Curated annotation (Swiss-Prot):
It is found in: Cytoplasm; Nucleus; Nucleus, Nucleolus. It comes from Caenorhabditis elegans. Residues 294-317 have a biased composition (Basic and acidic residues). One of its GO terms (molecular function) is cysteine-type deubiquitinase activity. Forms a complex composed of deubiquitinating enzyme atx-3, adapter ubxn-5 and cdc-48.1. Forms a complex composed of deubiquitinating enzyme atx-3, E4 ubiquitin-protein ligase ufd-2 and cdc-48.1. Interacts (via RRDR motif) with cdc-48.1 (via N-terminus) and cdc-48.2 (via N-terminus); the interaction with cdc-48.1 is not required for atx-3 enzymatic activity. Interacts (via C-terminus) with ubxn-5. May interact with ned-8. Residues 7-178 form the Josephin domain. InterPro entries: Ataxin-3, Josephin, UIM_dom. Pfam families: Josephin, UIM, UIM_2. Residues 276-293 have a biased composition (Polar residues). This is Ataxin-3 homolog. Expressed in germline (at protein level). Expressed in spermatheca, pharynx, dorsal and ventral cords, some head neurons, hypodermis, body wall muscles and coelomocytes. The active site is at C20 (nucleophile), H117 (proton acceptor), N132. The gene is atx-3. The keyword Nucleus applies.
């Protein structure tokens, strides 16, 4: 990557301890504005406020509802920190956020929580980037990937918060608006490997679900759809959180192919899905589908969208 690459203008913090909330806030705001001590003070302030509201005059010593010893902070702490910048966080499942849920690309940024790990999806210019402190740096995302990723993790019960308000202007905003980041070139060897994997993916999924001939994708958008779908498959133990994005891409794509070859609904199989947050299921909500049934539904939705894209392209011709 060249030193002059616009992506290098994006402020990025690497993971330290479990300070992902601090890193997420600073990367969202594009400056090293918050330290652990600042968020700790906010957490203590939030605890005292909650104790007063609940009338709990004798709280458990050393216990906090808004932080833990490892450095994790609650969404309430992040919300309080962003109030200074007139920014508001609203769960995408809130009925008021229906427009963002239907068209995620209309937002400027999202703060996401997966297994108590905070990271950011943020727009600079007209391009989306993943700012995740466990990665080596900012990751350029396609619009298709952003939409598919947010839809998938939201449907699995993870916490996605829409950032509302005007984000502080940064050098990266100005530079990338003028000079968009060019996606990295794929080497011939890597491209050949990707085509082979994609062909197998579409053939197996297409034949399993009756989605047509299962021809390999011939557009970048269709490739993005497949990769985004594969990326949504994560293991139950959360081991991916510490691995590089490139390793996760390849591993999850392989898993998606394996899942497409698993027994169908008439022969239930144990299929790893994104685990559901305990607090994410609203009271009175129905129990989630079985793993096999949910996986079948997700694959069916993906194939329907893929076939629709092909039909639209054929109509244009």
């Amino acid at each position: 990557m060249s030193k002059d690459d616009p992506i290098n203008s994006i402020f990025f913090e690497h993971q330290e301890a479990a300070l992902c909330a601090q890193h997420a806030l600073n990367m969202l705001l594009q400056d090293a504005l918050y330290k652990w001590q600042d968020l700790r003070d906010l957490a203590i302030q939030m605890d005292k406020m909650e104790q007063q509201i609940l009338g709990n005059a004798n709280p458990t010593p050393g216990r906090s509802e808004n932080m833990n010893e490892s450095g994790y902070f609650s969404i309430q702490v992040l919300e309080k920190a962003l109030e200074t910048f007139s920014l508001k966080l609203t769960n995408i499942e809130n009925p008021a956020m229906v427009d963002y849920k239907n068209n995620p690309l209309t937002a400027r940024a999202y703060i996401c929580n997966l297994r108590e790990h905070w990271f950011v999806l943020r727009k600079f210019g007209n391009q989306w980037f993943e700012l995740n402190s466990v990665n080596r740096g900012p990751k350029l995302l396609s619009d298709t990937y952003v939409s598919m990723f947010l839809h998938q993790v939201s449907s699995e019960g993870y916490s996605i918060f829409v950032v509302q308000g005007v984000l502080p202007r940064s050098d990266a905003d100005d530079l990338i608006s003028l000079c968009p980041v060019v996606p990295p070139k794929v080497t011939p060897k890597k491209e050949q490997k990707l085509e082979k994997v994609m062909t197998k993916f579409f053939n197996t999924v297409g034949k399993r679900l009756g989605g047509g001939s299962g021809a390999p994708p011939d557009s970048q958008e269709e490739k993005d759809l497949a990769i985004a779908f594969a990326m949504s498959m994560e293991t139950k133990d959360g081991s991916e959180v510490s691995r590089s994005s490139a390793e996760i891409d390849e591993e999850n794509l392989r898993k998606a192919i394996e899942l497409s070859q698993a027994p169908g609904p008439s022969e239930p199989a144990e299929i790893p899905l994104l685990t559901r947050s305990r607090s994410s299921t609203p009271p009175g909500a129905s129990e989630p589908f079985s793993n096999a049934e949910q996986q079948r539904r997700d694959r069916q939705k993906f194939l329907e969208r893929f076939e629709k894209k092909k039909e639209e392209r054929n109509d244009e011709k």
